[in-house]
Amino acid sequence: MWLSPEEVLVANALWVTERANPFFVLQRRRGHGRGGGLTGLLVGTLDVVLDSSARVAPYRILHQTQDSQVYWTVACGSSRKEITKHWEWLENNLLQTLSIFDSEEDITTFVKGKIHGIIAEENKNLQPQGDEDPGKFKEAELKMRKQFGMPEGEKLVNYYSCSYWKGRVPRQGWLYLTVNHLCFYSFLLGKEVSLVVQWVDITRLEKNATLLFPESIRVDTRDQELFFSMFLNIGETFKLMEQLANLAMRQLLDSEGFLEDKALPRPIRPHRNISALKRDLDARAKNECYRATFRLPRDERLDGHTSCTLWTPFNKLHIPGQMFISNNYICFASKEEDACHLIIPLREVTIVEKADSSSVLPSPLSISTKSKMTFLFANLKDRDFLVQRISDFLQKTPSKQPGSIGSRKASVVDPSTESSPAPQEGSEQPASPASPLSSRQSFCAQEAPTASQGLLKLFQKNSPMEDLGAKGAKEKMKEESWHIHFFEYGRGVCMYRTAKTRALVLKGIPESLRGELWLLFSGAWNEMVTHPGYYAELVEKSTGKYSLATEEIERDLHRSMPEHPAFQNELGIAALRRVLTAYAFRNPTIGYCQAMNIVTSVLLLYGSEEEAFWLLVALCERMLPDYYNTRVVGALVDQGIFEELTRDFLPQLSEKMQDLGVISSISLSWFLTLFLSVMPFESAVVIVDCFFYEGIKVILQVALAVLDANMEQLLGCSDEGEAMTMLGRYLDNVVNKQSVSPPIPHLRALLSSSDDPPAEVDIFELLKVSYEKFSSLRAEDIEQMRFKQRLKVIQSLEDTAKRSVVRAIPVDIGFSIEELEDLYMVFKAKHLASQYWGCSRTMAGRRDPSLPYLEQYRIDASQFRELFASLTPWACGSHTPLLAGRMFRLLDENKDSLINFKEFVTGMSGMYHGDLTEKLKVLYKLHLPPALSPEEAESALEAAHYFTEDSSSEASPLASDLDLFLPWEAQEALPQEEQEGSGSEERGEEKGTSSPDYRHYLRMWAKEKEAQKETIKDLPKMNQEQFIELCKTLYNMFSEDPMEQDLYHAIATVASLLLRIGEVGKKFSARTGRKPRDCATEEDEPPAPELHQDAARELQPPAAGDPQAKAGGDTHLGKAPQESQVVVEGGSGEGQGSPSQLLSDDETKDDMSMSSYSVVSTGSLQCEDLADDTVLVGGEACSPTARIGGTVDTDWCISFEQILASILTESVLVNFFEKRVDIGLKIKDQKKVERQFSTASDHEQPGVSG
């Protein structure tokens, strides 16, 4: 490539001059190419350690003048061919012109101008593609692709200098972190180390420091442990590695690949060595941290942050911290964790103004809101720019949010308005955060009753607080405490959140304020206000729609807090149904998961349907990520954290719990339902209060406190059942003595009776103990532990999926368990490669975790073609892609252009582990429909229908049993998806109302079992065109075999014999008076000994050294006897339905002469002369003149039994098909191609001399 000219002071230090003229020098890097000796090794080592560009471009051209000592680089090249092209251009276009100049300065100026012009011309047509990466970074990306053979689609994120510990020796080199791979390369004095690890294969990633490895990063895969150290900035490197591994786990979890953020703004000053991808990932990390800290919606993007102070009127202090600005919010977080948090939605802002600066208050900024609150920030570094950014965002904010914000905010400031709320104008408007229960609607106004306020108010007797005695007084005091807090710290979204707020939450939220504060602390209020009418729209869309999720919802509705009166009534049940169905419709990835019904029923007790819906959104999508999906990954991750915390805080108990296996049993129910399913309702709801304020750390603290309180009893337990019973009784007796609601006994407590109940435990005391003993947990630490556990959990689930898939493969498939697992990993890698590099962008090709394990990974025809070429024992040279396409169509039973692992293994097994008959059956079917390509289907219809004798009633015998192990629902899914409109709805309705009983499944199972009872007599007959294709395939298969000549002789003999059998069968059927187009049946077949044996002898190819055979050519036209072999190369007079059109375009594109026929005598034809487009036709009564201008004989046909019997007469063919091939070596080679596992190469460079 041409380079912008740069000075080079020392031209010959590490370079060898190969060509020169008075103005230019072509040089090669020392050590590149052959030899190089010790100098070459040293130069190569320097290039790697110093990251020299000479690794990518070992050739260069310098401009020089005779009297000057300075050289200028004008071009470089990665190959001799590339650099020679540039050299020749310079010689042809510049040499004569340069000789005219007198001044050397003019020569140099002219050359530099010319090179700059060439570069500008080349770049003129290049479209700008987002952020341009720095030149040094582009060079590193080229090195990475060249060194590791990565495609253009693999993007480099960053690269770092480090050492890889190979044994006890550190190898200095470069670590390349790409979107999908971790790569390392080192070259030191002839020793080369190359590593490639897929992020999806990593099972452990941690930063540690030991005596052996000072500050190192450990990377574990299923096969090995890798250690990297001596980083310049190990913290940055590890953080980026964590992020990339997280992206890979997310891809395994839900197939969400990495997509660049096109909306990321360009930097004002381009960073020198930071790529656009690195900036993108850094921005993502900051956005995620920002959203998690302030509980903001998932689409909120951080614009920037700056240091400042905030004036807090409640304690008259200036609190230092950070201000964060995003599209819709201004947030503040104090440096001290509990000092103050603040969230100001821009929709609430009325005035932003710069106040007067003073020595006490430098650069102040005042922000006023609609709720009459004013916030004063100071010590802002760039106040003018900040005000401008806020103004820009305010201009984009709608001036009036739907839902009457102003009227609701009046009640936020003045709590007295809560007692007399004004009715809303429409059901789509969300309620006030200060009074979420205020919206009342007449139930008779709608066809279905809608819970427009918390169900607790509707189903609880409205007795005055005075009648409740001490409990009522305590509740009144709580309300007063919160109202005082609101007066001092503000009410609503803009509340100052301090340590005092947490203290009030721990004392319990009064029931009248619970729904409001849940909405505020969870961030659900922000989403509800910004999406007015969204829930009502979802309810309308989802009404009457049936799916698997709605069926599961209906099944669980009556299991949701059945002990509570609100859910013993149709009003509560209907509200719960609408909320769960609306969420399943909003998020089909989750749909519905068990335990969502229990949590949602509690949310409905304290809020309207819309509020409960948005609280559920906050819970499922932000606060408990990945909890409520088919594999409850999030809960399993937190279960792993719980086990780790138990080891840290309760080491005595940890080992005992592991032995009993209790943690895995208890933690899922505790975490998924937030203790609601294991504690009395009035106690568990206090934990939910703290959860919405603090997050998952409260659940973990309480779980540890429960184990700590029962340590002695647990240590004395002998089995899991005893431990579970003891813990269950303890939790049943956790009481809330301050609750004003009538006590609702826990369902399990009602069903179990005990003469010796344990002592009651106060829930507030349990919370107090949990904070005293385990409050050292921090949100950042939990996120770090979540990453570590997520790797383990997802890889464990992947291993479970692999075992499940392997178990679903029938035992008679022939492969061992290890071979099946290796094949599965290769198959999975091919699928993932399509996700990495966009080979398969169709939604059908993407992984769907909701499908059965067997159907989750599928590959398309192009991916299968690559796997087939590398794994098949039937190597056919250039014919292999055609054979692979036929095999794919044969295995693709449901015609969705994708095959799963079971179908793939079935095809492989037929080639590797079948006996002679089974292998020939596979080969035979590859030349019959459905192996014909879709393009061939129309032209092949007539012949296929005739030759298969009602092919529509016969399924592919090889693929007929492929779905035996799939559930009936999976088999039904495809036809339903293909239909559209009302038809699919009707089917869905039928499915929702009546499901098939067990007899239906038994009938289906019996039908599938019957399909396996296929004999060779059931195979359809093969016509002449198909037989010719079979012969071509066999000739190609034998081309690379050591017994090539013997196999050619044998197949020539068999082919001529079968051709004559077909001819005789056709004549015999004609004599018996059958229809002329009928094929010969098994009874019509004449005995083989009656055929002329001398004809078969004539058809055998001569020896390779026979000179007559080479000289014969096709000069013997018309001289062949009746038993001669006819070579047909095409025909132009065929009709539309002729069998010659059964070939696809790919199979006929190499035809040399489509309209000519030539008859070659048997003696003059060699096996080497048979091209791909050569077909063999022969017969006793078939004269060459009858064929000229005609078509391939459509009445000719032959059966599989005849082919099998003929091949059995040739021992060399029998030995070829019975030969055992080890698939292990082919799998190993394919793994290297796919880079399925970490591969480390340690090579010595040859020829160290001098």
Swiss-Prot record:
Its main location: membrane. The gene is TBC1D9B. The modification Phosphoserine is found at S411, S432, S435, S463, S1241. Residues 879-914 form the EF-hand domain. PROSITE patterns: EF_HAND_2, TBC_RABGAP. It is a single-pass membrane protein. The chain crosses the membrane at residues 668-688. May act as a GTPase-activating protein for Rab family protein(s). GO terms for molecular function: calcium ion binding; GTPase activator activity. The keyword Repeat applies. It comes from Homo sapiens. Residues 414-443 have a biased composition (Polar residues). The modification Phosphothreonine is found at T397. This is TBC1 domain family member 9B. The keyword Phosphoprotein applies. The arginine and glutamine fingers are critical for the GTPase-activating mechanism, they pull out Rab's 'switch 2' glutamine and insert in Rab's active site. Residues 142-209, 288-356 form the GRAM domain. Residues 397-443, 974-999, 1069-1093, 1128-1157 are annotated as: Disordered. SMART domains: GRAM, TBC. InterPro entries: EF-hand-dom_pair, EF_hand_dom, GRAM, PH-like_dom_sf, Rab-GAP-TBC_dom, Rab-GAP_TBC_sf, TCB1D9/TCB1D9B_PH-GRAM1, TCB1D9/TCB1D9B_PH-GRAM2. Residues 508-695 form the Rab-GAP TBC domain. The record marks R555 as: Arginine finger.
